[in-house]
A protein has these predicted regions:
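Active-site phosphate-binding strand-loop segment of PLP-dependent enzymes
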Residues: 111-173, 177
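Conserved beta-loop-alpha segment that forms the PLP phosphate-binding cup at the N-terminus of a helix
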Residues: 50-77, 81-89
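Conserved C-terminal alpha-helix-loop-beta "cap" of PLP-dependent enzymes
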Residues: 290-351, 355-362
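Conserved active-site segment immediately N-terminal to the catalytic lysine
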Residues: 184-196
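Internal helical hairpin/lid segments
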Residues: 75-78, 251-321
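Conserved N-terminal alpha-helix of the aminotransferase class I/II PLP-enzyme fold
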Residues: 17-62, 91
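Active-site C-terminal subdomain of aminotransferase-like
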Residues: 196-287, 355
Length: 375
């Protein structure tokens, strides 16, 4: 007998479990088991990972799950490039997680209100890791508040120093867009992503990829959270990979199905192609804004293609209200928590999603027209 509603699980069962109704896909269904296996396989393939984990909630849930799993009672180092890597500090302090935490902040290369920011110099980072020998190093691949990206060579240098000190390297890739990070090449041990930016899907979880070293290490760790127990969610994924299913908390089954479908769409189109499109779109938008006299917060060499953050003296632009009148939703500027000063004022543009990437001319033209009206 087929499922009651054909658009939910046409080849499924009549729903009498204590978990779902007929209007949602059951986590025990053959259909959803395939969804989880597909998500795992895609994450492992794209990020060159040993293991994949889905943690319900969102990217921040994943950050906290990782912090509580690997950072509890440990010596931690954070590379802070803005507000959303300051989030690591907020998580640490709220949960009293590490035994100690050191922060290396991004900084301006030279004094000046509108001078660009660069991450902490890599030599300083390596020297600090060598001296402190942290158990875990946390960094943002792309920092959403400043539009900074850490290049692969920077990541590799951090990873090498961290591994030499016996530590794990955690990289927040939630805002990376389709600039996929190769964990094998860069040395990243724990990578955190989410569906709603680079994966062009609905927010519903964190997507976490583990290196072989992290997969080995996690077995000797103990989380301090029940709902955000990373090791438990890893076990759930491994149950699905083994052809079965398991339950810890309720997974967002329908949203994860949508994510799987988009993953398949991107795979068919080409992971390398969307990566190239992301870079081209970012470069083109940054050039357009520069022509209009808008200065980038991110210094040359660290300019993210998926998030563009520019200085402004216009409160209407900083809040995004002027762009609302043009039919565009941008993001308001936020502090960096990097000693930027009280007069720091920016606006932020996100360049995420297949619909932007596949239509670069249209995407840029929409922005160009709107800025021509408000500047």
């Amino acid at each position: 007998m087929p499922g009651l509603l054909p658009h939910v699980d046409p080849d499924g069962l009549l729903e009498y479990s204590v978990v779902f109704t007929d209007r949602a896909l059951n986590h025990m269904s053959q259909s959803f088991q395939g969804v989880m296996r597909d998500i795992s396989a895609t994450l492992k393939n794209v990020y060159k990972a040993k293991s994949a984990v889905v943690v319900p909630g969102g990217g921040t849930f994943g950050m906290e799950a990782v912090a509580r799993q690997f950072g509890t009672g440990k010596k931690c180092l954070v590379l802070r490039n803005g507000w959303f890597s300051y989030r690591w500090t907020q998580i640490f302090e709220m949960g009293n997680i590490p035994s100690s935490a050191t922060v290396l902040k991004a900084r301006r290369a030279a004094p000046g209100k509108h001078m660009p920011f660069a991450p902490a110099p890599i030599d300083e980072v390596v020297a600090t890791i060598t001296e402190l020998r942290p158990d875990v190093v946390f960094a943002p691949h792309v920092e959403t508040s400043s539009g900074m990206i850490l290049p692969d060579a920077y990541l590799r240098a951090v990873a090498d120093a961290t591994h030499a000190a016996g530590g794990l390297f955690v990289l927040d890739c939630i805002a990376s867009g389709t600039i996929w990070v190769d964990m094998a090449q860069t040395g990243v041990d724990v990578l955190i992503s989410a569906p709603q930016k680079g994966w062009s899907s609905s927010p519903c979880c964190a997507l976490i990829a583990l290196s072989e070293a992290a997969r080995t290490r996690i077995d000797s760790t103990q989380s301090t959270s029940f709902a955000a127990d990373l090791r438990k969610w890893l076990q759930i994924m491994e149950a699905y990979e083994g052809g079965g299913h398991a339950y810890h908390g309720t997974l967002p089954t329908d949203s994860l199905t949508r994510l799987r479908d988009v993953m398949k769409e991107i795979e068919a189109y080409g992971f390398d192609k969307v990566r190239a499109e992301q870079q081209l779109l970012g470069d083109t938008v940054r050039a357009m804004l520069a022509r209009k006299g808008l200065k980038s917060v991110a210094a040359a060499g660290f300019e993210a293609p998926g998030v563009v953050v520019s200085y402004t003296e216009d409160a209407g632009l900083q809040s995004g209200k002027k762009m609302l009148a043009q039919g565009l939703q941008i993001a308001a500027g936020v502090p960096l928590q990097c000693d930027e000063g009280a007069d720091f004022q920016t606006f932020r543009i996100g360049l995420f999603g297949l619909d932007k990437l596949h239509n670069i001319d249209r995407t840029v033209a929409s922005l160009d027209k709107a800025f021509s009206q408000v500047l």
